[in-house]
Amino acid sequence: MPMARVNYAYKPEDETKAAKAMGYEMPISFKHAVEICRAIRGKKIEEARKLLEDVVEMKRAIPFKRHKKKVAHRRGLEKWYAGRYPQKAAKYVLKVLRNLEANAEYKGLDVENLVIVHAQAQKGRVIERYMPRAFGRATPRFQQLTTVELVAEVR
């Protein structure tokens, strides 16, 4: 089945000074992806990569600002209290970030001066599965897919 053409939610003012990358329908938590995108937005690519690598190694936590109910306090968070280590989502967003960096190099942009101006997570399709149980019952096991898009511009 061919993949549909997906547009970006953000349009840069000057396409020649911007690089884009998208991870389409990845099997990660939408809530975790939203919080990771908020954490890396406004950062340089190198800073964002270091943050995500630290999250995967459980050295730094991602502040959870929207989805924060019953989330424990974490040390090392600046100006916030609740946080988690969303390792799986961080690995997938890190792949998209590396793709963004490769796209910028291909366009001939200065990677050291690129700032992530747009980082967004969107809900994708839901894969519906059912697990058979005893006495003829079935339990739904739905999987929400997530699309992550990143845009960086030279600043």
From Swiss-Prot:
Keyword RNA-binding among UniProt keywords: yes
Keyword NADP: no
Name of a matching Pfam family: Ribosomal_L22
A GO CC term attached to the entry: cytosolic large ribosomal subunit
Residue stretches in coiled coil: none
Keyword terms: Ribonucleoprotein, Ribosomal protein, RNA-binding, rRNA-binding
InterPro entries named among the record's database cross-references: Ribosomal_uL22 (IPR001063), Ribosomal_uL22_euk/arc (IPR005721), Ribosomal_uL22_sf (IPR036394)
GO biological process: cytoplasmic translation
MF (Gene Ontology): rRNA binding; structural constituent of ribosome
Record family assignment: Belongs to the universal ribosomal protein uL22 family.
Function noted in UniProt: This protein binds specifically to 23S rRNA. It makes multiple contacts with different domains of the 23S rRNA in the assembled 50S subunit and ribosome.
NCBIfam families, A to Z: PRK04223.1, uL22_arch_euk
Record text on subunit structure and interactions: Part of the 50S ribosomal subunit.
The protein's name in its UniProt record: Large ribosomal subunit protein uL22
Species of origin: Archaeoglobus fulgidus (strain ATCC 49558 / DSM 4304 / JCM 9628 / NBRC 100126 / VC-16)
Gene this protein is translated from: rpl22
